[in-house]
Amino acid sequence: MAQAEILLIEDEATSRAILETVLTDAGYCVDTAETAAIAYSRLQAARYALVIADWLLPDGDGIYIADRAAARGSRTLVVTGHLSDLPVGTASRHHILMKPTKPESLLAVVRALIGGPADQR
């Protein structure tokens, strides 16, 4: 099995399923995590080209997770429905995408960050 190139961290099940489908239909290999604890475990076990993290998680902070992923060499995208409340400096460290997002907007950002799926193999 090919190693996943994207880690998607989203606590809301419907949003997670939709985003995962958009990414896999576009040819990306995706791992998912619904909590910060699961995300940390996945980050310890594998390297990802891109980590997409929801900012507000029930057990942690998606920005903190994105910071850790970036320190390991991953590109990062923070998604949030609370753009005006993001901590100062977040946009200088991570790409930001407002929720809800259109599939084509998500894919445009992902392609800009890591290229197409064939570019990752």
Language-model-derived ranges and their functions:
Residues 13-31:
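Two-component/phosphorelay signaling modules centered on CheY-like receiver
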Residues 79-80:
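Hydrophobic/aromatic residues positioned on beta-strands within the core alpha/beta folds
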Residues 54:
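Active-site residues of response regulator receiver
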Residues 58:
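The feature encodes the CheY-like receiver
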Residues 7, 32-50:
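Acidic, metal-coordinating helix/loop segments flanking the phosphotransfer/catalytic sites
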Residues 35, 61-64:
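Acidic catalytic/metal-coordinating carboxylates
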Residues 101-121:
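C-terminal output helix
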Residues 10:
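Conserved acidic carboxylate
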